[in-house]
C-alpha cells in the first residue's frame, strides 16, 4: 500500500546530491581559500575564527581549519565560515550544485512540503539549492522558493540525536503527528535517531554512497519511488 506523507525532510549529501560534490568540490574549494579567508576576514569571520580556536585549544587558525575539514568535524563556526567562502564561489559561477534530476523534479512537484536538514549551515544549504545545475539543459536553477524551510545543527541539533528531530517536528507543527512526515538520508545513524522520534524514514541509496549491509530500513534509489 502506498503511503501518503504531508511533509518530507531531506538530507543533502548522498541523498539529493552526490557525496562527491561535497567531498571533492566544496571541501577542496574551501581549503584552497583558507589563507585568503584568514588574511581578509571581516569582523564576523574574525569572531567565528576566534570562537573556533577557543574551543579547540587555541591552535593556529589555518592548521585548525584544515584539520577540522579533514576529520569532517561538525563544528558550527567552521560550517558558518565554509558557507561564507562558498557564497563567493557560487556568486562567481565557480560552483554550481549537481542535484540529482529526480530530486529536482520531486522538490518542484512538492513545493512547500519539503524541508532540508543538514549538518551544513542554513546559509550553505540556501546557496546550494539556489545554484543548482539545470539537469534539463544550460543555466542554473533556484529551488529555494520551492522549499518550506531549512534546519542545521544550531537550529535543530545534531543529526544523530532523536531530540533534534523532535525539535524539527515541533517547529513545523507535527509534534503530535510525527508519522505524517518522512525523513530520507543515507546515514543509518541519522535514520535511527529520526525513527526514535516517530518519523517515518527511508535509506537513500545513491551511486558513490557507502554500502550498507543488512540494512533494516526501506531503501530509496530515487525520488520517483516516494
From Swiss-Prot:
Residues that coordinate or bind Mg(2+): 11, 13, 186
InterPro entries: Enolase-ppase_E1, ENOPH1_eukaryotes, HAD-like_sf, HAD_sf
Gene3D superfamilies per the UniProt record, alphabetical: 1.10.720.60, HAD superfamily/HAD-like
Residues holding substrate: 118-119, 159
GO cellular component, one term: nucleus
Cofactor note: Binds 1 Mg(2+) ion per subunit.
Subcellular localization: Cytoplasm; Nucleus
One of the GO biological process terms: L-methionine salvage from methylthioadenosine
Database matches in NCBIfam families: enolase-ppase
Name of the protein in question: Enolase-phosphatase E1
Source organism (scientific name): Eremothecium gossypii (strain ATCC 10895 / CBS 109.51 / FGSC 9923 / NRRL Y-1056)
